[in-house]
Amino acid sequence: RNGGVEIETAGGKKTIGIHEIHMEEDAGKLVHDEWEDVSIVDYNRSGVPLIEIVSEPDMRSADEVIAYLEKLRMIIQYLGASDCKLNEGSMRADVNLSVREVGATEFGTRTEMKNLNSFKAIARAIEGERERQIELIEMGKSVVQETRRWDDNKESSFAMRSKEDAQDYRYFPEPDLVPIVISDEWLAEVKAREPELRTAKLERYKKEYDIPDYD
């Protein structure tokens, strides 16, 4: 909980907060793009363990989102935890997006975008949904909190379902899994075994050998 990942932006370095990371079990996936009016269920991944990273709402553009995802992918691949292939489903990203007027302090109503199978599709979906929400607000309409499916071929999105609140997900504990207590000593032991991350190694080389950023 309460971690973060540093990215490079046009304005310099920026830290994107990570609210939490938790483990889930894949239930399968819906395939929408092969038929125009039919969705099918693919259970090939059913039961596969996955890790969900819940990010803080710190990103302000499609470029920042892509920079964040690329940094996450680099770290995960470097650690050997996953090959992070979006087209094969070993890395996935759902995008929650809202707009607000300049100077406003409260976030607007957010929507969640799904069916994003590449970084380019994610960037296009963000730009498309941003424009859609701005257009609704300028027309005096309200943005509905909902989950939308991105169609990259049509470069547009479609409403899938109204967005549920937390209680609608019906969370319940798994009775066959015993609680695991993670001690500070165990965490320290794991951290001691971690390899030096690529970015940390790069910074160390730059300092030790006086290598400029250009090189």
Language-model region placement:
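Basic, nucleic-acid-interacting segments
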Residues: 1-196, 213
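Long, charged low-complexity interaction segments
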Residues: 196-215
